[in-house]
Regions:
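Short juxtamembrane and helix-loop transition motifs at transmembrane-helix boundaries
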Residues: 39-50, 184-190, 250-256, 277-288, ...
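Early transmembrane hairpin of solute transport permeases
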Residues: 2-140, 313
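Alpha-helical membrane segments and immediately flanking helix-loop junctions
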Residues: 60-70, 85-89, 246-317, 346-362
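Transmembrane alpha-helical segments and their short flanking loops
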Residues: 34-45, 241-250, 275, 293, ...
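Membrane-interface helix-loop-helix junctions at boundaries between adjacent transmembrane segments
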Residues: 98-164, 168-202
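Alpha-helical transmembrane segments in multi-pass membrane proteins
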Residues: 17, 60, 64, 68, ...
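Generic multipass alpha-helical transmembrane bundles of integral membrane proteins
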Residues: 162-182, 186-281
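Central hydrophobic cores of alpha-helical transmembrane segments
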Residues: 81-90, 226-231, 322-328, 348-349
Length: 401
């Protein structure tokens, strides 16, 4: 799971830049489309769609590289060969498309969001097999006098051959089924059901509840939850982006941007509101100092100073608003999006440290930025009575001293 998470982190620049190109095709400003048509012609959007398709549109390819590299470092095996065997595996399982004119090729759609789960599973299996073969010593050993740049390719011959053989049999096996390919099997039996569950409000509430409880007990809830859920949420974002690219409407309300830019305003459980409550209302010396320390990091969605400095960890009083805020952000935003107050995210991604309001405008215009402000106010109200309680207790202790 950590390799998958690190693999996604490694391709973040590609995803962010690609989503920004998509943003340029649909900037939410009146008259923008007409202006661009007059400036660049009727097909002006294609100027931005090609970079989008070569980044976000084939994100599975970049994820393969990221995960293979991360696994290679963890297992201490050759990084380059790990990436190579991963691509061998994924290409072996990708069906060849034959056009009416007899042209053959690999459809790019198989490397988009729809191929994400196959890419993740295949990469993990390929590197695992490669590691097993190498660590068992099933390689061709050349004398030490042979230069490493010559010996290395020979050492990889047997592992690479085994990867080819195994995944060729896997390919043949799937072709004998009604699914016809591993791609169709994974998408139908695994990715679609997980996306269907992950895009529902009840499942999201459950995930956020688990995340909150993990944090309360001192575990990094965001890392644990994101390693499982981020591939699902990102694939939903990618499908929204693909729909926009085809001129259709984005349909997945819950996606990566929903979580990152509405639920986590200031960090898990929208703790920017908590930081603001402390700054504006705290009277005790302890919490005044904490407010000054935590506000700037919170503006960039970093809330560890609050979680461990307040602390929220193992704090029964602060655990209550922490859980309530995390879930409330999701419920209220989902309802507002469902009735049309807030637009559905089109899949544009910005760095997770982008401050709220700015991130909202970048991913969806002034309506999203305004909604982020509203959600910060809501979180402020949720945390306010609890901060007043613990601040009063702390102030009494300080006065007794």
């Amino acid at each position: 799971l950590n390799a998958i998470k690190e693999g996604f982190f490694g391709v973040m620049p590609v995803i962010i830049v690609g989503s920004l190109f998509l943003l340029f095709t649909s900037i939410p400003i009146n008259g923008y489309s007409e202006f661009m048509t007059g400036l660049l012609g009727e097909n002006w959007s294609q100027i931005f769609m090609v970079p989008y398709r070569m980044s976000y549109g084939i994100m599975s390819i970049y994820v393969v590289v990221g995960i293979a590299r991360s696994l290679a470092h963890f297992y201490k095996v050759d990084t380059r060969e790990s990436i190579v065997v991963s691509f061998i595996a994924i290409f072996m399982l990708t069906p060849v498309l034959v056009t009416e004119d007899g042209l053959k090729g690999l459809p790019l759609d198989n490397f988009s969001a729809s191929g994400l789960f196959l890419a993740i599973i295949t990469t993990c299996l390929a590197v695992e097999i490669f590691r097993f073969v190498v660590q068992k010593g099933w390689t061709i050993k050349l004398p030490d006098s042979v230069p490493q740049n010559v010996a290395k390719p020979f050492e990889a011959l047997i592992p690479v051959a085994i990867i080819f053989i195994i995944f060729n049999f896997v390919r043949i096996g799937f072709e004998m089924t009604s699914f016809k390919s591993a791609q169709n099997f994974i998408f139908t039996m695994l990715q679609q059901p997980l996306q269907s569950i992950g895009s529902t409000l009840p499942a999201t509430i459950l995930v956020l509840l688990i995340e909150s409880i993990l944090w309360i007990f001192g575990l990094h809830g965001s890392s644990i939850v994101s390693s499982v859920m981020n591939p699902i949420w990102r694939s939903l974002s990618a499908e929204n982006a693909a729909a926009i690219g085809l001129g259709k409407a984005a349909t997945h309300i819950i996606n990566y941007q929903f979580i990152a830019n509405f639920v986590k305003l200031g960090g898990t459980a929208a703790t920017l509101g908590l930081a603001l409550v402390i700054v504006f209302t705290a009277k005790s010396s302890r919490y005044k100092a904490l407010g000054k320390l935590s506000l700037i990091p919170s503006l960039f969605n970093i809330n560890e100073p609050l979680i461990f400095g307040m602390p929220i960890v193992l704090n029964p009083i602060m655990a209550i608003p922490f859980v309530i805020a995390n879930i409330t952000m999701a419920i209220v935003t989902y309802a507002s999006t469902y009735i049309g107050l807030v637009p559905v995210s089109i899949g544009v991604e910005v760095p997770w440290t982008t401050p709220p309001i700015i991130s909202g405008f970048l991913i969806g215009g002034w309506r999203v930025a305004l909604w982020q402000f509203v959600m910060i106010v809501v979180s402020f109200v949720i945390y306010l009575p609890f901060i007043k309680k613990i601040d009063t207790l702390e102030l009494n202790k300080e006065n007794q001293k």
